[in-house]
């Protein structure tokens, strides 16, 4: 398949993601009793900026990169969301993910709307200096629409605390004063928060703990399969192993490892490279598709979207599915899993730990007072447990599935703020 065809396929997939997000938002607002005008406001971002960023490469040439920043709804407060560096970034994906950030912030009851950014690039082929120049160029290009009270970026796919540090420094230079609250996910010495690196995995862990209670399963010795061994997947494997659960399957882009008696998680974590790859060290590797259908109690898709579909949903043997990735389960597959009695914890709830601790970082920056790792963990647990219970009860009260209940919970805050402002 050609690179051009891959690009077209990615654009089509992103459009489907955007349209499916709109479909569920429409139903959520209808269930909550809002008029059609509210959906017209919420179905698209308020603001979508496309920028062109010229970067001098190490060989002396100048390459122009395309970047995006989407701000979905700022009725509640500033928008918030990550910046991803990836060759498959496109406008529809960024728009959809900014809507998801509105939902995540609403679920966690944070004073934010949703934002998202991205640059079409392959950071794996770029030098340290090229990445720095690209990061600073992006901030210069979007500087008029971002800031601590406007829109607060954060790390995402292939971006990290170093890139956040460059971006914070560039923004501070432009404003001529230090502005750590402009961005989150920074190094600790530049105003980062304890617990930020593990926040997403901690949030998923808490959701698993709450889900097993609902299903009457003991976490100790529960059999868990984790698809994806990046930041969230690897930390989750560690947390589950430490909690006494039996991690029987993990995977990366190369394939999966499966052992019904349990994998040696400390060994795999030690051998994992910076891109989350470890299965290339083994010969007995199965496909990601095969791994998803293995017998287990808890399945955690923590890799990419559209992994559980109508084609394989009937073969999923887990009684609990917790979505640590964005959009790993299609709408059709969600219906099948619900009909089969599988408890599905949706992505916008399960992965809300990251933005929650980003909010804590922003609060600490504004106060100039910093919390211990234990304080951050305690506050995160309080938010995640409350969010899980609210969505679980919403699903029971309205007789809807957990995904629709999560959308209802997530969109309500921005919808109410928009109504009070007189926008609808």
Swiss-Prot record:
Root EC class: oxidoreductase
Keyword NAD (UniProt): yes
Induction: Enzyme activity is low in early exponential phase and reached higher levels in the middle and late stages of exponential growth (at protein level). Repressed by glucose; induced by arginine, ornithine, or to a lesser extent proline (in the absence of glucose). Not induced by glutamate or glutamine. Expression depends on the alternative sigma-L factor and the transcription factor RocR. Subject to direct CcpA-dependent glucose repression.
Annotated active site: 116 (proton donor)
pH dependence comment: Optimum pH is 7.7 and 7.3 for L-glutamate deamination and 2-oxoglutarate amination, respectively. Half-maximal activity for deamination is observed at pH 6.9 and 7.8 and that for amination is at pH 6.9 and 7.8.
Record note on disruption phenotype: Cells lacking this gene lose the ability to utilize proline, ornithine, or arginine as sole carbon source and grow more slowly when proline or ornithine is utilized as sole nitrogen source in the presence of glucose. A double rocG-gudB disruption has the same phenotype as a single rocG disruption.
Purpose of the protein: Devoted to catabolic function of glutamate (and other amino acids of the glutamate family) utilization as sole nitrogen source. It is not involved in anabolic function of glutamate biosynthesis since B.subtilis possesses only one route of glutamate biosynthesis from ammonia, catalyzed by glutamate synthase. Wild-type cells are unable to utilize glutamate or glutamine as a sole carbon source; thus RocG does not function physiologically to synthesize glutamate, but it is involved in the utilization of arginine, and proline as carbon or nitrogen source.
Record protein name field: Catabolic NAD-specific glutamate dehydrogenase RocG
Species this protein is from: Bacillus subtilis (strain 168)
């Amino acid at each position: 398949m050609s690179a051009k065809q891959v690009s077209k396929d990615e654009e089509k997939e992103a459009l489907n993601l955007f349209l499916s997000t709109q479909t569920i938002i429409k139903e959520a607002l209808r269930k909550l009793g809002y008029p059609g005008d509210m959906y017209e406001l919420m179905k698209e971002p308020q603001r979508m900026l496309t920028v062109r960023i010229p970067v001098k490469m190490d060989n002396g040439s100048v390459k122009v990169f395309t970047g995006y920043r989407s701000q979905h709804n700022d009725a509640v407060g500033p928008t918030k969301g990550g910046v991803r560096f990836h060759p498959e970034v496109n406008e529809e994906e960024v728009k959809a993910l900014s809507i998801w950030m509105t939902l995540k912030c609403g679920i966690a009851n944070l004073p934010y709307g949703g934002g998202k950014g991205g640059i079409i690039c392959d950071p794996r082929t770029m030098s340290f200096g090229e990445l720095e120049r690209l990061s600073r160029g992006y901030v210069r290009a979007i500087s008029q629409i971002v800031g601590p009270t406007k829109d607060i970026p954060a790390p995402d796919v292939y971006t990290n605390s170093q890139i956040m540090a460059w971006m914070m420094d560039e923004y501070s230079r432009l404003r001529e004063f230090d502005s750590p609250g402009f961005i989150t996910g920074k190094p600790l010495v530049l105003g980062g928060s304890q617990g930020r690196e593990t926040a997403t995995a901690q949030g998923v862990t808490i959701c698993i703990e709450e889900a097993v209670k609902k299903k009457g399963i003991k976490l100790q010795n529960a059999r868990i399969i984790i698809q994806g061994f990046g930041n969230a997947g690897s930390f989750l494997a560690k947390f589950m192993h430490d909690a006494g659960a039996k991690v029987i399957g993990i995977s990366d882009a190369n394939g999966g490892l499966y052992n019904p008696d349990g994998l040696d998680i400390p060994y795999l974590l030690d051998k994992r490279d910076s891109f989350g790859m470890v299965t290339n060290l083994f010969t007995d590797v199965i496909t990601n598709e095969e791994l998803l259908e293995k017998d287990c109690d808890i399945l955690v898709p923590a890799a990419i979207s559209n992994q559980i579909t109508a084609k394989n949903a009937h073969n999923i043997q887990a009684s609990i599915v917790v979505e640590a990735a964005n959009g790993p389960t299609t709408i059709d597959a969600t219906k099948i899993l619900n009909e089969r009695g599988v408890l599905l914890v949706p992505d916008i709830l399960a992965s809300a730990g990251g933005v929650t601790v980003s909010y804590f970082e922003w609060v600490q920056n504004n106060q100039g007072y910093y919390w211990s790792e234990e304080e951050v963990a305690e506050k995160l647990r309080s938010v995640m447990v409350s969010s899980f219970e609210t969505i679980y009860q919403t699903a029971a009260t309205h007789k809807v599935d957990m995904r629709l209940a999560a959308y209802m919970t997530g969109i309500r805050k921005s919808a109410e703020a928009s109504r009070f402002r007189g926008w609808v």
